[in-house]
From Swiss-Prot:
UniProt keyword annotations, A-Z: Chromosome partition, Endoplasmic reticulum, Meiosis, Membrane, Nucleus, Sporulation, Transmembrane, Transmembrane helix
Subcellular location: Endoplasmic reticulum membrane; Nucleus membrane
UniProt GO BP: homologous chromosome pairing at meiosis; meiotic chromosome segregation; meiotic telomere clustering; regulation of reciprocal meiotic recombination; sporulation resulting in formation of a cellular spore
Subunit structure comment from the entry: Interacts with MPS3.
Membrane-topology descriptor: Single-pass membrane protein
Transmembrane regions listed in the UniProt entry: 131-151
Main function: Involved in chromosome segregation during meiosis. Involved in meiotic telomere clustering (bouquet formation) and telomere-led rapid prophase movements.
GO molecular function: cytoskeleton-nuclear membrane anchor activity
Gene: CSM4
Stated name of the protein: Chromosome segregation in meiosis protein 4
C-alpha cells in the first residue's frame, strides 16, 4: 500500500517538474522572440530617423538652390564667374549627396527582412520608411530640375 502512495507522489512531483520546465522553456523562447522584435523595431526607427534627416538635407539644398535661382533671375547684370563657381559647387554638392543617398537607399532596399514573424509596429515603421524613401527620390528629382533651371538662367 505504501508503494502505490509513494509512486503517485513521485509521479505527480515529476509531472509537475516537467510542466514547470516546459513553461520555463516556452517563456525563454517568448522572451527571445520579444527581444528580437524590440531590436528590429528600434533598428527600423533608427533607419527612419536617418532617412528623414537625409530628406531634410535635400530640402535645405533645394531651398538654397531656389534662393540662388531667384537671385540670379533678379540680378541680370551679375558677375558670371561667381555664378559659375557657385553653380559648380552646387553640382558637386548634388553629386556627392546623390551618391550617398543612392548607396543608403540600395542598402535599405536590399536588406533582408529583420524578423521572420510580422508585427504591426514594424510594418508601420516599414511603411513610413518606404514613404520617406519615395519622398527622398522625388526631392532628388526636384533638386536636379532646379539645378537645370539655375544653369539655364546663368547661361542666358
Amino acid at each position: 500500500m505504501m508503494d502505490g502512495s509513494i509512486t503517485r507522489k513521485v509521479t505527480s512531483t515529476l509531472s509537475n517538474q516537467l510542466a514547470t520546465w516546459k513553461w520555463k522553456l516556452q517563456l525563454s523562447l517568448l522572451e527571445r522572440k520579444l527581444a528580437t522584435i524590440n531590436n528590429d523595431y528600434f533598428l527600423l526607427q533608427w533607419e527612419l530617423l536617418f532617412i528623414t534627416n537625409e530628406v531634410m538635407k535635400w530640402k535645405e539644398m533645394i531651398a538654397f538652390l531656389e534662393s540662388q535661382l531667384f537671385c540670379t533671375t533678379q540680378n541680370f547684370v551679375a558677375q558670371e564667374t561667381h555664378d559659375r563657381e557657385t553653380f559648380q559647387s552646387l553640382v558637386d554638392d548634388y553629386n556627392k549627396q546623390l551618391s550617398e543617398n543612392n548607396l543608403i537607399i540600395s542598402v535599405l532596399k536590399s536588406r533582408p527582412q529583420l524578423s521572420s514573424f510580422p508585427i504591426y509596429l514594424s510594418d508601420e515603421v516599414c511603411s513610413h520608411l518606404k514613404f520617406v524613401i519615395a519622398e527622398l527620390n522625388s526631392l532628388i528629382i526636384v533638386f536636379f530640375i532646379s539645378l537645370v533651371f539655375l544653369w539655364v538662367s546663368i547661361e542666358v
